[in-house]
Amino acid sequence: MTDKKAIITYDDQKERDARNELYELLKECPIPEDQVLSNLGLFLNSKNLSRILFMNYIYQKIVDVQGVVFEFGTRWGQNVALFAALRGIYEPFNRHRKIVAFDTFEGFPSIHEKDGDSSMMVEGMLSLTENYDQYLSSVVSTIEKDNPLSHIQKFELRKGDGIVEIDSYLEQNPETIISLAYFDFDLYAPTKKCLEAIKPRLTKGSVVCFDELNDPDSPGETLALMEVFGLENVTLKRFPYVSRISYFIVE
């Protein structure tokens, strides 16, 4: 039976063994509990650190751009937590920099023929543990408590199919301008729908990021971008230390 919580990786056995060993060391960590969080860098490998560096890099590009942050396909929510922390660093009093995360929290809702035939293209793939959205909400709420304006909730988790939730959110929040949109749905249909929905709400300087462009395992993401924006109309860039993430700045 397919493990629908699993992800596709491209590492070899030696790398997997090293990662598993590091995880065991984390579980056995002898650091006092009140000092563990301030020493999490002890367990960061280069791959995971590079993604954090990218999030910092891309967040800096929107500090002077008005608008909220959208993440499409948040899964375990690491990016949401990072964006909340980065907001606390760069603009702690910006109550308008709301972070909105969209996810079914139950895996892929459906597969389109344009999503290809990769082994990951299975309904329900990339599912999460039960009630994970509630846990994630608690984590991000706690992060916000450690920053200014903690009495104002500046994040929202939208649980459900992005095809439906994007219209619902924008109808409920007609004032929405988007400074950063991060796409990690992996799928054609919700990516295309959400690109179409947010396009009129992007401003010059807004940043649009993708996790799976030019990826044979997730061809639908590229096709969605081609159909909504056209590759000839955007300047796709990549961060030199992260292989898979692409982005463009609205010009």
Named regions from a protein language model:
Residues 2-10, 14:
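Leucine-rich tandem repeat or coiled-coil scaffolds
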Residues 13-15, 19-46, 63, 67-251:
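S-adenosylmethionine/decaboxylated-SAM
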Residues 53-64:
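Conserved alpha-helix/loop element of class I SAM-dependent methyltransferases that forms part
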